[in-house]
Amino acid sequence: MTSLQQQRVKYGPPHHIKRRPYHPILESLEFQTNQHLIQEYSLDIVNTLSQLESLTLVNPAMIDLQPEIQWFMRPFLLDFLIELHSSFKLQPTTLFLCLNIIDRYCAKRIVFKRHYQLVGCTALWIASKYEDKKSRVPTLKELTIMCRNAYDEEMFVQMEMHILSTLDWSIGHPTLEDCLQLAIDSNNLSNNTTNDIENKSVRPNRKSSISSAVTAVARFLCELSLYDKYFLSVPPSLIAITANLLSCSMLQIPHASITLKNLIEQEIINPQQKKQKKALSSNSSRTTTASYTHQNQSDVRHSSFDEDIDLDSGDEEDDDEDYIDEFYETNNYDDTNATTFDESISKSTTVNDENQPPQIHTPFLSGLDEDSILSIKKICLMLIIQLSKVTEVLSKKYENLGVIQVINNFHSNYKFIIQSIYENQELLLNTINDSTNNNEIDYKLIQSSEILLQFPKFDEYLTEDEDENVSTDDEANSQPQGYDGSGSDGNNQLFTPKSPNAFSSNSSLTLNNHPQSMVPVTPPSATSQYSLFSNKNNRTHESTSGLNSTCNTPTHISISSFAPPQPPPGSILKPKLTSINSTNSLKIKKLTSNSNSSNINIHHGHHNTKQEKRYSHISIGSNSSSKYDGFSPIKSISTNGSLITNNGSLITNNGSFTNIVNNTNSSSPLMNQQQQQQVTQSSLYQHHHQYHQ
């Protein structure tokens, strides 16, 4: 009876119903019909996105004026929003739109520290209403639970109205996901670049697999760009294009590079060639007309004297004056020897060129020019630096998709280039943050970014004769410094140095972890009970690193390949002395007068402070002023099979160190007169021995 009563008591709708998965065939059919309908309005969509991109850009200098919010708080909030986004299974566009709403609001309103998490959750709530379907939108009760009851439901409603009124109810924004899909669609992944003949049934699957892999890696890079301040001042279309190029480079897919090469040739190189041809033709026509006018003037000068005399000058002076006035009114004489051009046409064309907006090409919403290409290379360098600061939340999200393994393989293939970027990290950040020297980036860094992006190569399209005839002063001034690589020669080369063939490397995608790398310190998760943004944590001023988190996500990263580079124990630039049996400290012998060479023997024994002070100018290993000791992407080469270090010391095959005589400073105050004589005698002996040989 009791069991029957319990069964009768259950009223209302059934609970815990398992949702049936949507059929994949129906989903693919809906996607195809949607794409077919969107193609009719593709131009209107791209024009609208380009207008919104210029209107919704955020000025990070305004966020710098916030009294309580600092930039180190941004990773805390972003990790919390990524966890909420993945737990509610929202669309990728929702996360990028949420961050844009937060940045636009913080650039216009003062936000207190205790309300920062409230602004983030409310922005996610607004973005989910704008992008996702109604069943996926989080409720107010769920948001209050996620925030550990730090805010009431009414506070979310009030903050929503305040955000929308601040943004003038304009939420539309070309997110990184939208720009990324435009860039991936322009790759033409359906084109078969191999010579293998494939079945038609296999091609769609191959295309979908390639596009899904490129999308996963590029989306990871786009989400990584949300953490840094620099990417707020860059158009999202250029960030998406750079992420697309870098992901295709990581996956060894040439489609993005080929598409970019065709687009640049079509929109930049070919118009410049046409302009140069017109300039050459106009110069030739001017020279011919100048020669003809010179001949006509010579004929006039050599005419007879009687023809130049007006015999009726006394009778018809008034008529002659009227005729001269009418002649000058009708014919505006120009004394520049027929070398001028029509000013009205030139003014009209220049005015039209200035007033016209930049031409929109499908991935480039802000226009395609040389400045946009340079900014793509700078974004690539900043993304490589940002890869060393990946948080644990982001790495855990993309680890199951295989993105972290692809990045580790990319790091192992381009290890020395990435290390050189890390060594010049401070210089790069200073030049980028400085608005006056924004274009003056190191030539080697630009070249390394081209190699990492697999940037397309361009042949020289100007001959020597054209370079001599065409004056390129205006064009050289318009091109940014440090980009065209022309220097003081003035050659009209469009792009930076020819990078090596991007697809000739025989690198295989193998996982290569480096255990010696440092683990970067990342902020803890924002879902902690004692969150940095909640009211509970404001009572104390304890550091967040010592607080315990209640979330399931660790607070440190497991990606070791993109950590700041550290010298490996068996590096060539820090050699091991195999010929020495002792394990004690190093001791340098004094140079005796009987020595006939400049070899410095290294023995082991106790420390001798006098010897160390005396020979402190001779350093073993790499330069001590370098940030990363022992690491240099460019190795010095010696003809006799030995290796030359950065300080001038020579490492021979038997492991002994010899100091180069020419680099020895004999005038050093640490050397006495006897040692200077020994050095000069040894150098004379070496020259005498080489002369007899």
UniProtKB/Swiss-Prot annotation:
Biased composition range(s): Acidic residues: 306-320, 465-476
Bias kind Polar residues: ranges: 273-298, 489-516, 524-563
Keyword line: Cell cycle, Cell division, Cyclin, Mitosis
CDD domains linked to this entry: CYCLIN_CCNO-like_rpt2 (cd20537), CYCLIN_ScCLN_like (cd20559)
Listed Low complexity bias regions: 666-685
GO cellular component, one term: cyclin-dependent protein kinase holoenzyme complex
InterPro entries (UniProt xref): Cyclin (IPR039361), Cyclin-like_dom (IPR013763), Cyclin-like_sf (IPR036915), Cyclin_C-dom (IPR004367), Cyclin_CLN (IPR014399), Cyclin_N (IPR006671), Cyclins_cyclin-box (IPR048258)
Induction section of the entry: Expression peaks at G1/S. CCN1 is stabilized during germ tube formation.
Subunit: Interacts with CDC28. The CDC28-CCN1 complex associates with septin CDC11 upon hyphal induction.
Full protein name: G1/S-specific cyclin CCN1
Naturally occurring in which organism (per UniProt): Candida albicans (strain SC5314 / ATCC MYA-2876)
Name of the gene: CCN1
